[in-house]
């Protein structure tokens, strides 16, 4: 794949840090790794990330937005995730994923999605567990240290950095809408990468105390 065929210029990908992994790797993610740096950080192959973004957008576009559920508990991902939902109509859960959301019909927030999108297999493990139990396809953002045995479609990426997650969700939003036929011209988008970046760079949350176990949990302000 030449640079001209990428979704954005290679320099844009590199500037976002989308390729910067961690100092751990798993067998599952080995095929997406380009090299290891002298400081021990594994570097992801940008072209494989680009390829998987295209595949994921086409796959998700086969579903109506209300049949997709996208979730994330990572602070810097919540804002871009909500922008993703705002422009695509896809349902999102930014923050704590309540146990039983997909498996307990008695729960008032019960949902029956046809596909689930997660931002981190480890952080979003409750959503991953429930999606696996009900047998729906799972798309996930995965870094070099993740296990992917329950992920049907892996998007290899730095899923922790502000710029990286902002770019990922910007591109997913753009490509999903293009594949759905909602937009045809990249120059006439109703949103910008900078808008997604602003949401990632300025997370709004508050700390509350859970009455049962007294644990501190971060929640987004309304």
Curated annotation (Swiss-Prot):
One of its GO terms (biological process) is ribosomal small subunit assembly. Keywords: Ribonucleoprotein, Ribosomal protein. One of its GO terms (cellular component) is cytosolic small ribosomal subunit. It comes from the Archaea. GO terms for molecular function: structural constituent of ribosome. The keyword Ribosomal protein applies. PROSITE patterns: RIBOSOMAL_S2_2 (PS00963). The keyword Transit peptide does not apply. Signal peptide: none annotated. PANTHER family: 40S RIBOSOMAL PROTEIN SA (PTHR11489). HAMAP family: Ribosomal_uS2_A. Belongs to the universal ribosomal protein uS2 family. This is Small ribosomal subunit protein uS2. It comes from Methanocaldococcus jannaschii (strain ATCC 43067 / DSM 2661 / JAL-1 / JCM 10045 / NBRC 100440). The lineage of its organism: Archaea, Methanobacteriati, Methanobacteriota, Methanomada group, Methanococci.
